[in-house]
A protein has these predicted regions:
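Conserved alpha-helix/loop element of class I SAM-dependent methyltransferases that forms part
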Residues: 1-9
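Short secondary-structure boundary/capping segments
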Residues: 3, 28, 158-159
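Conserved SAM-binding loop
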Residues: 9-92
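S-adenosyl-L-methionine-dependent methyltransferase catalytic module, highlighting the catalytic core
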Residues: 68-69, 75, 79, 83-175
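A generic fold-level signal
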Residues: 6, 19, 162-163
């Protein structure tokens, strides 16, 4: 049985597992006490359209079957201007490939697919209807000393294991 949470400011964590955050609903496939709504996110997000003001997906997208489908679901449940925070293994990190349950790999270009301005795309438009704005892209570096490297952008693009995680903040665009 799923709990009901009446609120105008619903915030959700997708795939939060045992990590409970005060004030946020935790949606996960695991039926454990910290999970508020047990669901398979491959099948969608069991919340109404335009009902969520903030969405967090930490190390989840790489495990799901269809990135486009989950992004459409995130957009569907997001209110206009909702903030979406995504944390994924960076494609050039060993951790991205080490885990055999990872189905997808992510770069900065991955999230350009979801921009409203289609000229940023280098791949065909498959009639994706959800639109996001990229607010910021950041990284968690593989070692402390990397913070002090000059030209981090160059090293990140041309060498393995400089950045281990990419953090992307998006904003849902709805008319």
């Amino acid at each position: 049985m799923q709990k009901r949470y009446p609120s105008d400011n619903i915030k959700i964590i997708l795939g939060g597992g045992p990590k409970k955050t005060e004030g946020w609903l935790n949606l996960d496939i695991l039926p454990i006490p910290e999970v508020d709504i047990v669901c398979d996110l491959n099948q969608g997000i069991p919340l109404p359209d335009n009902s969520v003001v903030a969405i967090s997906a930490r190390h989840l997208l790489e495990h799901l079957d269809d990135t486009v489908k989950i992004m459409e679901e995130i957009w569907r449940v997001a209110k206009p201007e909702a903030v979406v925070s995504i944390k994924v293994p960076y494609y050039a990190s060993m951790g991205a490939y080490q885990d055999p349950t990872h189905r997808r790999f992510f770069t900065e270009k991955t999230f350009q697919y979801f921009l409203p301005h289609k000229e940023h795309r280098t791949v065909p438009d498959y009639h994706f209807r959800a639109e996001f704005e990229i607010v910021s892209i950041g990284y968690i570096w593989s070692a402390r000393w990397v913070r002090y490297l000059p030209f981090k952008s160059f090293f990140r693009r041309h060498f393995l294991n400089i950045a281990k995680t990419m953090i992307v903040e998006l904003r849902a665009i709805k008319n």
